[in-house]
């Protein structure tokens, strides 16, 4: 099961650990667009679509988790910063089973969605930072242009 955080703008709240994550620039895609990207990328990587589920996950609202995911599941995390530690504390506050895959510094994380969005906003090359199938969909949906429009509005 893969959780998509910030699935609905009404479920997004500002987080002290990462104030940017609740911005429009950080969330330019709809839940369904992110669902399609994840599913397409996983299938492209050879994962059978019947082997996974993708669900909305209002990560900043632990009281809602039970409506979206089985609480007896193991919650896997990768931690790169204070926000990752905050997510872990949300899970632990409910007594959920948590498994940290790895914890490395933000600098060692590698490419991030923020990096890709920033490249798009600046009109720089980004396609080599995502799977081919994802690049096709992002271009088809006009996401670079959407991000540039958001940037102009926020400037």
Predicted regions: what is each one?
Residues 1-155:
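Nucleotidyltransferase catalytic core that binds NTPs
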């Amino acid at each position: 099961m893969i959780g998509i955080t910030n699935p609905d703008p009404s479920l997004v709240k500002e987080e002290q650990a990462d104030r940017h994550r609740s911005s429009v620039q950080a969330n330019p895609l709809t839940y369904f667009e992110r669902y399609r990207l994840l599913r397409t990328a996983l299938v492209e990587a050879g994962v059978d679509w019947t082997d996974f589920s993708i669900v909305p996950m209002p990560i900043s609202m632990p009281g809602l988790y039970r409506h979206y995911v089985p609480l007896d599941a193991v919650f896997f995390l990768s931690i790169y910063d204070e926000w990752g530690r905050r997510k872990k504390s949300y899970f632990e506050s409910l007594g959920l089973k948590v498994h940290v895959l790895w914890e490395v510094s933000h600098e060692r994380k590698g490419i991030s969605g923020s990096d890709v969005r920033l490249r798009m906003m600046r009109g720089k090359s980004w396609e080599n930072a995502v799977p081919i199938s994802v690049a096709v969909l992002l271009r088809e949906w006009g996401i670079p242009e959407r991000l540039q429009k958001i940037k102009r509005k926020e400037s």
